[in-house]
Amino acid sequence: MSYQYPMDETWSTEEIIDVVNFFSLIEKAYEKQVDREEILALYRRFKQIVPSKSEEKKLFTQFQEASGYSSYHVVKKARETNESNIRM
């Protein structure tokens, strides 16, 4: 991994850790597989930190441009499936 996760300098240390954990799980969904409930739980926490839809879209775009992984598609798949594990 030779890129940085998108973040906001106004976030607390705990919030930064939670956002990094969310983006790390997105990576894992592409590289291995992840628990659907874990994705949804971390996304809910992400939305507490980033409630604005436009800010979410901006961060998702920055992450996708840096990593090639789409957070939007992982979250969408987790919401729409009943499978316990997600793999992209």
Curated annotation (Swiss-Prot):
Belongs to the UPF0223 family. InterPro entries: BH2638-like_sf, UPF0223. This is UPF0223 protein OB1419. Signal peptide: none annotated. HAMAP family: UPF0223. It comes from Oceanobacillus iheyensis (strain DSM 14371 / CIP 107618 / JCM 11309 / KCTC 3954 / HTE831). Pfam families: UPF0223 (PF05256). Coiled coil: none annotated.
